[in-house]
């Protein structure tokens, strides 16, 4: 796995997945985010075994694909420190995820992607299409019925 991505892309994706990353995990892998890289995109996936969030970002420069996991919180904190216009170079070096920018070089320990629990995707028998605006309106009209 070897690719470049703009800071804003990876930070946006990491922030979206952090909400589901376990703070007090029973399995160490649940503190990690799954990286899946192909020619044009980076998919980040996080789970707490009840919920799963997956994001897709466009990569700037692809060298090789692959999968790994890395600590979500550490990675997010590190990426936020980089300058806003940074292009971040991610690549695997043995059991480490190497991260390079113009401001420095960093290593994060990884866990095998095979250990990451992924939900089975189910195809819906029936589906509807709804605009985000209509969905937001429907949720706001029923929010009073939710428990605290």
Feature locations, PLM:
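Structural preference for solvent-exposed beta-strand-turn elements
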Residues: 1-148
